[in-house]
């Protein structure tokens, strides 16, 4: 909510507070921590600090794997990693995550979903179409 309103530092502070409380309570199951990590990465991207998003997105994907989560739980952080590596100018890593994100979005979102459209369009751009 704060991030959408342009209040990114407040958004980051709230996400960090929730994340710290979850970890303090020993919570590493399910999708809540994964969602917090993924959402924090979006804030870092919006702040122009993509490198700071990498550890949170890596953890989000690890949590998905540890907990047998699929669909958006994997596709969303994968898409955001593609966005991070695009922002960092690492085309090789962007391509790896972009292809995986498109596959994931095709499995869990309808063709008209905005993120699926954006990912497919970016993949076409990367492939020179």
Question: Which sequence ranges carry the predicted segments?
Answer:
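TPR/TPR-like (Sel1-like) alpha-helical repeat modules
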Residues: 92-110
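Extended non-membrane alpha-helical scaffolds
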Residues: 4-15, 24-25
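Fold-core signature of tandem repeat domains
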Residues: 40-43, 56, 60-61
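Short coil/turn linkers that connect adjacent helices within long alpha-helical scaffolds
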Residues: 24-28, 66-70, 107-111
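Conserved alpha-helical positions within TPR/SEL1-like repeat arrays
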Residues: 3-4, 31-46, 72-83, 114-125
